[in-house]
Regions:
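C-terminal transmembrane helical hairpin of 12-TM major facilitator-type secondary transporters
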Residues: 268-337
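A late C-terminal transmembrane helix in Major Facilitator Superfamily
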Residues: 148, 157, 341-377
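Paired small-residue
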Residues: 98, 109-117, 315-322
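Conserved MFS/SLC helix-loop-helix module at the cytosolic interface between two early adjacent transmembrane helices
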Residues: 70-108
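Extracytoplasmic
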Residues: 11-44, 50-54, 71, 243-248, ...
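Cytoplasmic helix-loop-helix junction between adjacent transmembrane helices
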Residues: 116-151, 343
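Extracytoplasmic gate region of multi-pass secondary transporters
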Residues: 28-38, 218, 224-281, 365, ...
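Helix-loop-helix hairpin linking two adjacent transmembrane segments in secondary transporters
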Residues: 152-199
């Protein structure tokens, strides 16, 4: 790789961070501060019944996740045929359009349609395409690069609630959503249009040789390792999704009783702390075996989730701090290990399928959590026991992956 391309790959990293910060921040991580005012307004105008208000919020988030999984498969197919830039520009259009529709919604059906568009955008501009983009530019130091890139999801989740909460309090949720949508059209779309490109020169660098090595998606799905990996991804995303989307509502429930501003700060802290987990895990995975690092991160996530068995306002930080580090690291290593285990020959398609499995686990988690909260009068205590159970199963799944990968290496000798 010539010196110019070695430098430009860090421009690609910056664009990927920006893409994830805006796309995941506006479609997923930054939305929880909007939930309470949306819920209250829709109940007040009769758009939804108060008895299923929590389910309405959970369904909205579930739609985003489920559609993002389906669109990730489609996005992987388009990437292999059209390249990354046009696919990512389409993602901007879907995201910006979905947010504008949502800001004008006055019925549950319109909200669901808007969240569907926002979810579809993630298959074209979210984690999977950004991982593919960066993986094309990096071989040596790929774990560190991905660790940096995937902090974008946390940066968006940390920054947007801090900006949105005071704006919502002063101007209302609709104006705030329109204002935040401008970042898609004025910043992200031009940056992708003018700066995103793929490596143009072939060299003898390992990154160029490895780009065509690995399994097809058909070969990957016939291995036990793929399905163990998929099960782990689904189990990991159950607690990640529920905590990132519904923990803010748990904190504001009568049992915990914190203010909306304090809950928004806790939400931002969750994402901000996960930045350290993502960067640390990415760096460690370049120095030690990545699967060992992921086992450690998933163990930390499970240990933190035990605090949920007796959560109070006073001990909530004992959950948030280690859980954020653990989930941030596990999230990064799922993306890295997909390329390590199955190669980069059809990594876009493979990541698309894995994303679909991930969001299925997330959607199940959101659905169960919202349902149990409604059944208990808005109390999330029992609903969040599911986070502890899923975290325990995710840890066991990482041990299974470790064993299967070790066996595959032994058979290759």
């Amino acid at each position: 790789m010539i010196e110019q391309q070695k430098k430009y790959r860090w421009v690609i990293v910056v664009i990927a961070v920006l893409s994830l910060m805006i796309s995941n921040g506006l479609a997923i991580g930054g939305l929880p501060p909007f939930y309470k005012p949306i819920r209250e307004e829709f109940v007040a105008i009769g758009a939804i019944d108060a008895s299923w208000a929590e389910t309405f919020i959970g369904n909205s988030a579930n739609i985003t996740f489920l559609i993002s999984g389906i669109s990730s498969l489609i996005g992987g197919w388009f990437i292999s045929r059209s390249g990354l830039r046009p696919v990512m520009l389409l993602g901007c259009v879907l995201l910006g359009g979905g947010l504008l529709i949502h800001s004008q919604a006055s019925s549950a059906e319109v909200v669901y349609a808007a969240r569907g568009l926002m979810g579809a955008s993630l298959g074209f501009i979210g984690v999977a395409p950004c991982v593919v983009l960066v993986s094309k530019w990096f071989d040596k130091g790929r774990g560190t690069a991905l660790g940096i890139v995937l902090t974008g999801t946390s940066l968006g989740g940390a920054a947007i609630p801090l900006v949105a909460a005071p704006l919502i309090a002063r101007y209302g949720w609709r104006y705030t959503m329109v204002a935040l949508t401008s970042t898609v059209w004025l910043i992200l779309f031009p940056a992708i249009a003018f700066l995103v490109r793929e490596p143009s020169l072939k060299t003898s660098e390992p990154a160029d040789i490895a780009a065509n090595d690995g399994m097809t998606i058909g070969e990957a799905v016939r291995t036990p390792l793929f399905w163990a990996f998929g099960a782990c991804a689904a189990l990991v995303f159950y607690p990640i999704f529920v905590t990132s989307q519904q923990f803010i509502l748990y904190l504001q429930s009568p049992k915990i009783g914190v203010s909306a501003e304090t809950a928004a700060f806790a939400q931002s802290a969750l994402f901000a702390i996960s930045i350290g987990g993502k960067f640390l895990a990415g760096t460690l995975s370049d120095k030690f075996r990545a699967i060992r690092v992921m086992v450690g991160c998933s163990l930390l996530m499970f240990a933190a989730s035990l605090v949920l068995l007796g959560l109070t306002a006073d001990n909530s930080l004992y959950f948030l701090l280690p859980f954020a580090i653990g989930y941030g690291g596990t999230f990064v290593l799922l993306q890295r290990l997909a390329a390590d285990f199955f190669g980069r020959r059809e990594i876009g398609k493979i990541l698309g399928l894995i994303t679909l499995i991930e969001v299925t686990g997330a959607a199940i988690g959101g659905r169960i959590t919202g349902y149990l909260a409604d059944r208990n009068g808005g109390d999330y205590t029992y609903a969040f026991f599911g986070v502890t159970i899923a975290s325990a199963l995710a840890f066991l799944a990482t041990l299974a992956i470790f064993a299967l990968h070790k066996k595959r290496l032994e058979n290759a000798l």
